[in-house]
From Swiss-Prot:
SMART domains in the cross-refs: ZnF_C2H2
Coiled-coil residues: none
Protein name: Zinc finger protein 488
Similarity section: Belongs to the krueppel C2H2-type zinc-finger protein family.
Quaternary structure and interacting proteins, as annotated: Interacts with OLIG2.
Organism: Homo sapiens (Human)
Annotated spans, Important for transcriptional repression activity: 72-187
Chain positions covered by the region annotation Disordered: 77-180
UniProt record, GO biological process: negative regulation of DNA-templated transcription; oligodendrocyte development; positive regulation of myelination; positive regulation of oligodendrocyte differentiation; regulation of DNA-templated transcription
Keywords, ordered alphabetically: DNA-binding, Metal-binding, Neurogenesis, Nucleus, Repeat, Repressor, Transcription, Transcription regulation, Zinc, Zinc-finger
Length: 340
């Protein structure tokens, strides 16, 4: 009798007793099958029953049913996945250990789903999720696998890029301070519809009113006397529209220009009075517009000048040395260089 591994020591005796119990002696073909399966049993403890297709002799047909039943029971007893009672578990092969790493993934997914369900139960009844908190029992896979962190579904949708600025809440917004006095009604603002706030006017370029045209910014006569402006553009950090009092022209005014506040730099450079007509008190954006206005409106006044004013002009533009008269002052200054 050959020596069997410890995990299959009882298997040959079972097959022999079952075959003897049914009255069929052990045939030489059965012995050949046991001998052929010995090297396979010694390698990985997995019995392989090899049957010969070309059976010779009448003993192959005798006890065939008994041998089939015995081999089936032997396969059930020595199955690698089911442990036998009273015997140690057989060592797992490399293929089974590698397969166990993939079988853990469904369990980890189930844990993650359960943790998400628990986080949803702890949310507020209004439907707003609470602060995202990491669970203490983080599911970990076997060696070499990644670590999965469980976050609530609401926090996952609220995650944003690290480079984007956080949105300010309405409570954190500074209190709006009105530019105009509190006692003045909004109807007295004329064409400037709406109430202007200092927080909405961070700079001059952001001042945009649908009724305030670009051309109207240059059609300004003068700034009101009771509108002190802060020198923001000269170095002060505060807004230039803070603590200002706007003076709105009366509705009966014949001027069609829009009244607005200009920063101090524009008034200091003289942009509001650069193309200004002294006769009709109008300002123009372009110099060509002022020239066209002077030729069309004030041309008749210069047609018939006063003789007394013309005489005084000639006396003022006369050379004190040779008493020569000139029409222009620069002609007189050029003439005076010849006497030096």
């Amino acid at each position: 009798m050959p020596e069997w591994p410890p995990c299959l020591s009882v298997a040959p005796a079972l097959v022999i007793t079952m075959a003897a119990g049914k009255g069929a002696p052990l045939s030489p073909s059965a012995e050949n099958r046991w001998r052929l399966s010995e090297p396979e049993l010694g390698r990985g403890c997995k019995p392989v029953l090899l049957e010969k297709t070309n059976r010779l002799g009448p003993e192959a047909a005798v006890g065939r049913a008994g041998r089939d039943v015995g081999s089936a029971e032997l396969a059930l007893l020595v199955a690698p996945g089911k442990p036998r009672p009273g015997k140690p578990l057989p060592p797992k092969t490399r293929g089974e250990q590698r397969q166990s790493a993939f079988t853990e993934l469904p369990r980890m997914k189930d844990r993650q789903v359960d943790a998400q369900a628990q986080e949803r139960e702890h949310d507020d009844p209004t439907g707003q999720p609470g602060a995202p908190q990491l669970t203490q029992n983080i599911p970990r896979g076997p060696a070499g696998s990644k670590v999965f962190s469980v976050w609530p579904s609401g926090a996952r949708s609220e995650q944003r890029s690290a480079f984007s600025k956080p949105t300010k809440r309405p409570a954190e917004r500074p209190e709006l301070t009105s530019v105009f006095p509190a006692g003045e009604s909004a109807d007295a603002l004329g064409e400037l519809s709406g109430l202007l706030n200092t927080t909405d006017l961070a700079c001059w370029g952001r001042l945009s009113t649908p009724k305030l045209l670009v051309g109207d910014l240059w059609n300004l006569q003068a700034l009101p006397q009771n509108a002190p402006l802060c020198s923001t553009f000269l170095g002060a950090p505060t807004l230039w529209l803070e603590h200002t009092q706007a003076q709105v022209p009366p509705p009966s005014s014949s001027s069609t220009t829009s009244w607005a506040l200009l920063p101090p730099t524009l008034t200091s450079l003289g942009l509001s009075t650069q193309n200004w007509c002294a006769k009709c008190n109008l300002s123009f954006r372009l110099t060509s517009d002022l020239v066209f206005h002077m030729r069309s409106h004030h041309k008749k006044e210069h047609a018939g000048p006063d003789p007394h004013s013309q005489k005084r002009r000639e006396e003022a533009l006369a050379c004190p040395v040779c008493q020569e008269h000139f029409r222009e002052r620069h002609h007189l200054s050029r003439h005076m260089t010849s006497h030096s």
